[in-house]
Design a protein with these regions (language model features):
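Hydrophobic/basic alpha-helical segments
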Residues: 1-169
Length: 169
């Protein structure tokens, strides 16, 4: 897809790149990440390298370091986007905004609410098989339990996203 973008447009500025990348390339890189999130370093690097190469399409940014290119293009690392997506889905599940019963994935830890935590902490269970430690229901627990009360009790998904993004930046 990146090759097609390169040969289809003679000169791509950062605004055009953002529109093309966000509509054509990024959806392919983020397809079904809650079901299959890469956990091997080689897979994570491989996906990130696609974005790294894609950001070099903008001629003015070719000689700038990758983290700086991301800031200029208002992009984030794919791993950060996957984590954000996991947190949004967890929020939606726990608040009944999905047609899936969250109890199939999580158990609320009602007995361990303290001043540093929040009221919707999840119990952490060890997986029976090593391969299961990368499943959605296991990989989100630590990150979710580390969120603030303000984030977890957001009144809507949009408010949760805004509060999560504010806390992460």
């Amino acid at each position: 897809m990146i090759g097609l973008i390169k040969i289809s447009f003679e000169c791509i500025d950062s605004e055009m790149f953002s529109n093309l990348y966000n509509s054509l390339v990024r959806p392919l890189l983020e397809y079904c990440v809650q079901a299959w999130s890469p956990h091997l370093e080689k897979d994570i690097t491989l996906l990130e390298n696609v974005q790294r190469r894609a950001t070099k399409i903008v001629k003015d940014l070719r000689n700038i370091e990758y983290p700086e290119r991301l800031k200029i293009l208002n992009l984030t690392r794919l791993e950060d986007r996957r984590t954000r997506g996991d947190m949004i889905l967890t929020y939606r599940l726990l608040n009944g905004l999905e047609d899936i019963d969250y109890r199939k994935f999580f158990t609320l830890d009602d007995g361990h609410y303290n001043l540093r935590g929040h009221s919707k902490k999840l119990k952490k269970f060890g997986p029976n098989l090593d391969v299961r430690r990368f499943f959605f229901s296991f990989r989100v627990v630590d990150k979710w339990n580390g969120l603030t009360e303000e984030e977890v009790t957001a009144p809507s998904t949009r408010a949760f996203k805004l509060r999560y993004d504010k806390a992460e930046n």
